[in-house]
């Protein structure tokens, strides 16, 4: 069992409060480990069945997402938009492996939403990992807005700067140059600019 899934299992198991929940979770894990078409169908039903606990939906979505089953997409995006950063990180890892073309658009929408800026870190990191056409515009837009805002949210701004550096796209140089004027971002922005300047131009 991969480390990410083991961490998810440990986290969920620690949150269970009754023998019935423990038994239900063991049954769910048995489906995950079965790795058969019939088991995948059962996991997909968990995603849409009424009154399923959040931990069941999360586990089923992660298991399906990491094997490329696109039925997990909506649940994983919901988890990516969740207030719990650990749950967001788990969803991002599954989405990175899902291979659904909708993922980058959804992550960009979350990353650029000014109302959700506190929770933008994992959508930003996911966009960097995906290296999708939406990645650079979304990170640049978010960084531009944060630099102009009264509250800069330095951790999110730094993630944008570092992400743009990792993507190495010359289109990001103007906003990175603005970011370099802020002491909290100077070192990361200068490094990102250097990478963007040496990137091959299409």
What are these regions (language model features)?
Residues 103:
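Residue-level hotspots at or immediately adjacent to binding/recognition sites across diverse folds
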Residues 1-2, 14, 18-36, 45, ...:
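Structural detector for internal amphipathic alpha-helices that build alpha-solenoid repeat scaffolds
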């Amino acid at each position: 069992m991969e480390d990410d899934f083991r961490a998810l299992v440990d986290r969920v198991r620690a949150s269970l409060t009754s023998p019935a929940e423990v038994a239900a979770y063991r049954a769910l894990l048995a489906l995950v480990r079965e790795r058969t078409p019939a088991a995948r169908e059962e996991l997909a039903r968990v995603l849409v069945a009424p009154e399923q606990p959040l931990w069941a939906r999360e586990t089923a979505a992660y298991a399906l997402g990491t094997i490329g089953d696109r039925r997990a997409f909506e649940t994983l995006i919901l988890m990516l938009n969740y207030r719990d950063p650990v749950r967001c990180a788990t969803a991002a890892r599954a989405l990175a492996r899902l291979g659904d073309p909708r993922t980058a658009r959804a992550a960009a929408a979350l990353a650029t939403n000014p109302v959700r800026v506190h929770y933008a870190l994992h959508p930003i990191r996911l966009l960097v990992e995906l290296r999708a056409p939406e990645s650079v515009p979304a990170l640049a837009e978010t960084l531009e807005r944060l630099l102009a805002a009264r509250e800069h949210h330095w951790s999110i701004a730094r993630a944008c700067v570092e992400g743009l550096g990792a993507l190495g796209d010359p289109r990001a140089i103007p906003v990175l140059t603005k970011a370099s004027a802020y002491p909290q971002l100077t070192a990361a922005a200068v490094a990102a600019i250097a990478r963007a300047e040496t990137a091959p131009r299409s």
